[in-house]
Amino acid sequence: MHSTKVPTILAKKNYASPSAFTPENLLGEARRQKGLVEAGVPEVCVLDPDGDMVRRLKRAGRGTVDANWACYHTELYRLTEAGIEFGIVACAVGAPFAVLIAEELFASGCRLLISMTSAGQLVELQSPPYFILIEKALRNEGASYHYLPPAEFSHADPALLDAIAGAFSGLRVPVQRGATWTTDAPFRETAEAIAAMKAKGLMAVEMEAAALYAFAQARRRPVLCFAHVTNQMARVEGDFQKGEADGTVDALAVITTAARRWRSKRT
């Protein structure tokens, strides 16, 4: 006999009610404990869930750690690329962690957040690696349901997508546009689940976009999510190859192009 009760994750949700626990208060207490001054982050920030970008940049002696980033869980790495200063946070893997950091970044002065996550190929558009600008993401995780009522997908802001349309045509690695599957459980990507997601036309599987877009819509914050399609879920030999410098060169080109176009449309 099946229960008719509402699943716990959907119960007693008031989406219009403010949170009693805020990122501003948390960061304020962290600064007090750590003896840090209140200082803003760059207006364009980046989530680098794999951490390869930050590791490569550190190895090359580029950029600096922000000594006043008060987050308890991460470092923020400042890098200037093509005249734009970025704040990059590495290894915030998965929907809850990504959204926690997004909340803290926007509370600290971020104006645009770009997520560059590695992803597994579902639809065989071409051989990896390549990029997808995620237009919508299937909500197969949990964090998005704390920000928006139940729905199948979270969507990128159409105005933000329009602002960067056509910006990537000159890059050496293609940037496709389409939908992805956001999961909380990569090691539960069963053959049946993969087939179902492919039948929906989803191009890749990743772990953050649905939650970040739900956060963006609920909080009215500009967020762009890219999937760096690097693998076929370890089902072929020689998988997980990102390209030059662990994909850093091409990923930075995509990020910088998006940021430059966003800034030009803002002015």
PLM regions: where:
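Accessory terminal and edge-of-domain segments that mediate assembly/interaction
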Residues: 1-114, 120-267
